[in-house]
Amino acid sequence: MSVDHQAEARRQIEICNACRYCEGFCAVFPAMTQQRTFALADMTQLANLCHNCQGCYHACQYTAPHEFAINLPAALAEVRTESWERLSTPTWLAKRVQTHGGLVAGLMLFATIFFLMWSQGVVGGNTFYDYFSHNTLVAIFAPAFVLPLVVIAWSLRRYWREVGGQAVRWAHLKSALKAAANLKNLSGGQQQGCQYEDGDRYSHKRRAGHQLTMYGFLLCFASTSTATVMHYALDMPAPYAWYSLPKILGVVGGVMLSVGTLFLMKLKRTADPKLGSVSRWGGDWVFIGLLFLTASTGLLLWMLGATPAMPLMLAVHLGCVFTLFLMMPYSKMVHGFFRLAALTRDAQTNGG
């Protein structure tokens, strides 16, 4: 781990703790005021509590060219991404994925070619189950989904021990889930929004983009979960009609996820890279792009139906999903898990 990033973030936090002008912006500043010195665990917790709304930067009187050169969003972003890498297993892979987006693109291309070659032996298929049986898909994707979750669980365990987390009560989890659900820490403190893409102007655009993306993803996950229950518990195997619950959840979720990620990409084009982790900027783009491709190819697959283009779109979609699953512990996908853990720990320290 880079000692320079830790030292720089600590220097800035200590100045901010003396100033306290920004303590109404987000959860970072009230948490910061509870102590005078900041160890590695404290910096890890504060960094993951930060949502990079950037409001504190635009309100600060000590940014460059002042000699203090405060840029807290960037300093915490570096510590935050390094904490994901340091606490993951293996660490080198996490760092590689965060800084080399081409690795993710290469895996997606390889997976797509694999699924395309697999489907070549089928002639005249009408549904994607004619190309890949249910059991085949389960055999491929169940390990690709479960094993990364095990890695994430291990990373969160290490995080929890590092920040001194205690036994979680329902009140702690409820507080964290509420803050995550409404993205309270992207509200700017006074519900005026944050300043991510418009310089020093307030906006709720980033909050809206994140909510579209988050809830779209959750609806897609609910679609898959519902289909699983219908298949195994109710003996109702796929394919399902357009008006069935899995289809409705999947289509609505896919549209929300596609629109949300497109919106976030638009905002990211106008954002200032210097207020985030510059070395991981490319990795952020790849992650958002992969989410968009996963959602949009799923929608296209549904719309194409039994057309000749269906096998190709099926291979691309499965390649995207496979890559998204495998890269969960190492891409920015993991930030949601760490942020929820940080919010839970914050609720504990505040007696929530």
Segments the model singles out, each with a brief description of its role:
Residues 1-4, 352:
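Short, intrinsically disordered terminal tails adjacent to the first/last structured region
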